[in-house]
């Protein structure tokens, strides 16, 4: 795995049991890093609205979706969210490049407002998954890297979904041409066969632990961290991902899937089709002009899901969105079958 991450200059890994664990490790390492660097006041975290970073208190605190947080508040203090670069739904512009610049500038402005000497890290998913497969403009991540460098803030990429091929690139941050300081993995690391997560850090961060400091011991770990069975499954899985070029397949088949999904725009309720690789969403609206969303669990959306399931296509519902995240071995033939089923579902579902 570390050989795969050599271009990002990642040199150490902390194993855990899943994505939430991996994020928690990243947040703790970030705070400890700045204490070791003699900047103990750098404790705050920035993230994006619509973000999802797991179910631990740290991860929930940097998540940007209210439903994931509300029942457990108050959460960790010192966590702030900025507007997501959501092209279909934002208050700024319909121009992608302009939106990316605006959102990056928002981060810079908020860091200045809080004080750069108090901010530890910015954490984000290269493509926001559970929030609705929000694909940022191409300039967003490079600009975020510049902002983090300018204000001496660590950049954490939550690659729990995007890691190991789903975007068409081996890693989501690599897809955008950006090198984070810390990366979080799970899911694709061993295709979920055995629970495993990983937090990996680059040389810059590792160097802080070379100091003879009473705060240097990393007080973090889980009962099953680095479990041999989980790691063996990961090795076998990653060998297949790499040798069979599953990232390449995800990119090729994903592009074809998006093209075919364009056929759904003939229906009055399909407001947006978006995605990268095999990470796709179809957003449903009551009106294409106003973009009024369907309420969660609306009978119309549930009927579409039911028909698809009965016909053999399992589709996740997230609010008013159909989430499509098939295996990386998906083929164009599979896409054609899925589209045929979805067309049937939309034709048969009643919308008043």
Predicted segment positions?
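Conserved N-terminal phosphate-binding loop of PLP-dependent enzymes in the Aspartate aminotransferase
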Residues: 1-352
């Amino acid at each position: 795995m570390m050989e795969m991450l050599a271009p990002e200059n990642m040199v150490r890994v902390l194993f855990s049991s899943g994505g939430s664990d991996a994020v928690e490790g990243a947040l703790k390492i970030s705070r400890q890093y700045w204490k070791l660097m003699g900047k103990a006041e750098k404790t705050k975290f920035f993230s994006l609205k619509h973000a999802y970073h797991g179910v631990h208190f740290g991860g929930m605190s940097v998540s940007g979706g209210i439903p994931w947080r509300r029942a457990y508040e108050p959460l960790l203090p010192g966590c702030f969210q900025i507007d997501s670069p959501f092209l279909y739904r934002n208050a700024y512009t319909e121009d992608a490049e302009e939106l990316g610049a605006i959102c990056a500038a928002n981060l810079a402005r908020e860091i200045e407002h809080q004080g750069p000497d108090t901010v530890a890290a910015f954490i984000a998913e290269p493509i926001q998954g559970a929030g609705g497969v929000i694909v940022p403009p191409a300039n967003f991540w490079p600009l975020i890297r510049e902002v983090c460098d300018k204000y001496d803030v660590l950049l954490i990429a939550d690659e729990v979904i995007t890691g190991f091929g789903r975007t068409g690139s081996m890693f989501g941050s690599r897809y955008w041409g950006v090198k984070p300081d810390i990366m979080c993995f799970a899911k694709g690391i061993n295709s979920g066969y055995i629970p495993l997560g990983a937090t990996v850090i680059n040389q810059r961060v590792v160097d802080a632990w070379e100091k003879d400091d009473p705060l240097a011991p990393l007080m973090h770990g889980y009962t099953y961290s680095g479990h041999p069975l989980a790691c063996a499954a990961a090795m076998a899985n990653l060998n297949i991902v790499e040798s069979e070029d599953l990232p390449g397949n995800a990119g090729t088949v994903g592009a074809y899937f998006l093209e075919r999904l364009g056929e759904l725009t003939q229906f009055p309720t399909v407001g947006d089709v978006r995605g990268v690789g095999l990470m796709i969403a179809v957003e449903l609206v009551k009106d294409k002009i106003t973009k009024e969303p369907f309420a969660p669990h609306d009978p119309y959306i549930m009927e579409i899901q039911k028909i698809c399931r009965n016909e053999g296509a399992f589709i996740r519902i997230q609010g008013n969105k159909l989430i499509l995240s098939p295996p990386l071995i998906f083929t164009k033939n599979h896409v054609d079958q899925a589209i045929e089923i979805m067309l049937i579902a939309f034709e048969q579902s009643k919308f008043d």
